Amino acid sequence: MAAVSSGAAAAAGIPNPNPNRERPQQQQQQQPASAALHPVAHRSAAAACRPPLARVGYYEMERTIGKGNFAVVKLATHMITKAKVAIKIVDKTQLDDENLKKIFREVQIMKMLRHPHIIRLYQVMETERMIYLVTEYASGGEIFDHLVAHGRMAEKDARRKFKQIVAAVYFCHCRSIVHRDLKAENLLLDHNLNIKIADFGFSNLFSRGQLLKTWCGSPPYAAPELFEGKEYDGPKVDIWSLGVVLYVLVCGALPFDGSTLQNLRARVLSGKFRIPFFMSTDCEYLIRHMLILEPSRRLSMEQICKNKWMRQGDPDPEFDRLIVECEQVKVERETELINEQVLMAMAEMGFDRERTLQSLHADSYDHYSATYSLLSDKLKRHKNLCVAPPTPRPLYPLQDQSNAVSMTVPQVQLINPENQIVETDGPMALDSDEGEEPSPEAMARYLSMRRHTVGVPDPRAEMQEDLQKLAPGFPRVAPQAPFPPLMPALAQMQLMPTPSLQPGQQLEYKEQSLLQPPTLQLLNGMGPLGRRASDGGANIQLHTQQLLKRPRGQSPLVTSPHPIPAVAPVDEEGSDAEPDPEAVQRSSYKDCNTLHLPMERFSPVRRFSDGAATIQAYKTQLENNSLIRQLKQECEQLQKMYAAPQDERLMEHTQQQHVLYQQEQQILHQQIQALSLGHGENQPSSHLTYQLQRLRIQPSSPPPTHPSNHLFRPANQSSPPPPGGGAGLMQTHGGPSAVQYQHGSALYQSPSDSPPPTSLPRMALANQQPSVPPGSARTLAQTLPQQQVTIQVQEVELGGGAQRQSFLATPCHRVLGKQLSADNAETHSRSLSRFHTSAYEQLTAQLLGESVMGSYNPYLQGASLKVPGLEGYGLSYGGPSALQQALLSPTPLEYRPPPQVTPTLQGLLSPRHSLTGHADPRLPPQELAALLKRHSRPAPPTAPPTIPQDYGEMLLLQQLGQAAESLDSAPPQATPTQHYHHLLQIRTPPECPAPSLPHSESMEEDEMPAYHEGLLAKAAAPCTEAHELLAPPLGSTPPYSSPTHRHAYLRSATATRESCADAADAGMESDHNGYGSRSTQSDSYRPRGALQRHHTIQTCDDAYEQVEPMSGMSLLAGKALSSARMSDILSQSSLTGSQQLQQREGPVCDVDADVHSSSCYPSSCTTDMLLSYKTPDLQYSVEQAGV
């Protein structure tokens, strides 16, 4: 390397006045260099006696400010210009030929780079064993230390810094230079806090399209292709590192981190990192497109410079000028005009003008060019240039000065700028760079927090031990007095005492052999943030083990009387009026535009890689902190002062609610007793309809979305039924209902509000139950939960007994099976929850008499339709009517469903359409038909008591047999020819969100039949302890769990949807009566969390990570998929039932259309029937049951 001189004196370019003393001067240079390279070995010796002051050429060595892979960086002062410089000292004896070539390549590359945001090379000196690289000194320290001391940067400040970084990296790329070790530790700040990129030890030259293959750099900043061991494009690697750097600037934390190198590698290769809430969308876009796994898809430097986020804020003409200059590759900064003012100043110092010009044109990087560059930089900073009086020999005035003072201090303390070895005479001292001393908080952490770049593997495992030994040719010098007299002899220079080797802030050149866990003096000594960001996996693992061995207790930062400056604001003046550091720190976190490191004490941000040990230590610190206890005591005092009036008002409100509840219950019981006492033998037969109306059993209601919905109608606007007959009450598809949904207050109408009609007689009830053959439906009913429904009854004018008999004997319950409503069930169950057991027993006693009185337990299914004592009543009107007994009596134990489920109910009431995930436990309509016919048909007046039993059993068997035969392709039953009026209809449900299935953005758009489950609550023998038909809901049911909900339910039907929302929020599904049951969701679906930017994990391939990821799916794709799932359910299953029930559908129906009941419709004709079928006299519609 021609540019590297063969000796320090020769490299200085100054004629040696005493050639015989050149060798002692070299020995004087070698001694401190050895000490610099082996601080551990010399530490004990330095404690007893400090080594003499070292001078290399025209530079006075001061302290160590950095340690690299193969070198040590020392802070020095140029003896002529008094400028601070950083000297990188490389021991050639410790390098093999390959690494030595890299050192020469670094020198060559730094000569090519003259940029305001790149550390500049001033001079190169070489001895037999050492290479000295004199570089620019950045007094602001690393940007990493700046982030530690001040927290994350606001995006405005981060943009300014990042622009300078991009300009410098772009400048390198335009000159075919790739850095390959960009990280926060290699980004330095000068005295004006401008960026200076340092450490080109891993840089290399590249050509367009050429791939590199050397694994180097810092693991947290390394691109994924480096971890994969592939050949890589150099500029793309730098762009990935730039993305990590920008994330660190804006967030104050690393996007990829791990406890070990393997974990870190896995996270980098996954490409997933966290985007905090405070990051802007434009900044996020820029980072995500720099951190893309595929190198070819990453942004180029030109695209980064033109990015929207980079162009925000005030205009930056300096950045634009630098970018234009980068694009002009052929324009070199070395062609700048020579500054005559600097040349004149050097001539006054005794430098030869011609030799200086020759050195500048030849890029010699000797003492002449170094002095010129330092003076030129000083002129740019201070705008004036004051020089010392001219002297032909620059070294002699230094030797004659006896007032040059130096002071040795402990390693961890700071050097007093007033005690530096400086030239105090002459005007040059006024313009010295003493003001560029590193910031105190940065200087206090240099050695204790050094982290190391992982470079090319070094086979010499014993390098550290060799470095600790004193190499041959580095003789020791006997200790001298601290302030010896300075004699005018050049050999006496080695007797000058040297300041202690101390941490600095300049030019880190990491050394792999020095990978050791750092001494933690940061952030309470807790967590991974106590270490440097670029540490490799080995150091991280040792550091974690060191953490685990530490005792858990109060943080030393909290108890220490002298907080470490790393976490507290720096008190430059040392004034006692400054607030408590913790108070200042807490106040700084209130600023929403700044973010401190995650593990700082009051920081709201937690590092993604923080482990359990860190959390536990933080919790222990909080528990032991006296400030927390003081806040708790203050909170308790405030509660005692202000909580009492609130509790009193709450108790008063609760008492009022309780009184209202008792009054309503008392009025309800009185009305029931008045109704039961007023029943007589000659009471009009239409009292049945009136009683069912009081029990909230209403005629059919309009669709939930219809303008005449009951939710929007007053309480007393339900129109009475028309007297014409049942046909007039029916409605076409989508048409308004003839009888509007009645408000909940109708439950408390007095008997005088509407006189009961007088046309329907009351029926006696047979006490004998027919036996039903067990089938497949029995097994289905045994394994499924019971449901409850409410039936609406239309008032029907019937003729004589024959007409009534034929009406009840025909299968005409299509509307009943079609319009089943979960809302009716919830409303009915809610109203019946007001019934107390004793009140129900009183009602039963007054309705049936003492002889037929039986105890009623609303939570047991032990009671049945077999009422003792009713056998002998015959046509007596003293007992309850058939529908009353059918609706108010518990389900019998021996009652069994038929073996098949009708296709209509499969379509309307299938588990998929009910959105609950359960199978269908509802009672098929043929059972209800048989039940109602058996109870509604009056027995002949002259028949013995057993005839009604036989006839009722015959009717039920006939109806069940007809339904079963129609589904099994058996010969159909004989059907009457006349048309019949429908007696029962089921209301449609209100809008209710489905809590369990994957839903689209609006469940109202899908309009699924959310809770269509069951006609009558039917229990088989194993289900005897399920809920009865009209049983009150459990007290723990979410909609009824509080008095507020109970009163809200009585006053407005809109609470149905609120209760469903409550059940869904609790993670429970509500059945028709509000009973909660754990939802059975599929494994592929998990509820979407709140879309908080800070709880979102980014994917480098432009996609958010799902909570449970699906391959290649972004958040928007997952959102669309969620809607698609719902649409698939609606389109594939339609109204014919779920896939499970479709497999059990019966053959094609062969019953005539005139008497085609819903119980025998196959799946092939269900859809057409629901949408278009209509009997001549009997109108009905499908009321938004998911069609």
Swiss-Prot record:
SUPFAM superfamilies: Protein kinase-like (PK-like). Residues 337-377 form the UBA domain. Keywords: ATP-binding, Kinase, Magnesium, Metal-binding, Nucleotide-binding, Phosphoprotein, Serine/threonine-protein kinase, Transferase. GO terms for cellular component: cytoplasm. CDD domains: STKc_SIK, UBA_SIK3. InterPro entries: Kinase-like_dom_sf, Prot_kinase_dom, Protein_kinase_ATP_BS, Ser/Thr_kinase_AS, SIK, UBA. Residues 59-310 form the Protein kinase domain. GO terms for molecular function: ATP binding; magnesium ion binding; protein serine kinase activity; protein serine/threonine kinase activity; tau-protein kinase activity. Residues 739-749 have a biased composition (Polar residues). It is an enzyme of class 2 (transferase). The modification Phosphothreonine is found at residue 214. It catalyses: L-seryl-[protein] + ATP = O-phospho-L-seryl-[protein] + ADP + H(+); L-threonyl-[protein] + ATP = O-phospho-L-threonyl-[protein] + ADP + H(+). Residues 1-41, 548-587, 697-776, 1060-1092 are annotated as: Disordered. ATP binds at residues 65-73, 88. The active site is at residue 181. One of its GO terms (biological process) is microtubule cytoskeleton organization. It comes from the Eukaryota. This is Serine/threonine-protein kinase SIK3 homolog.
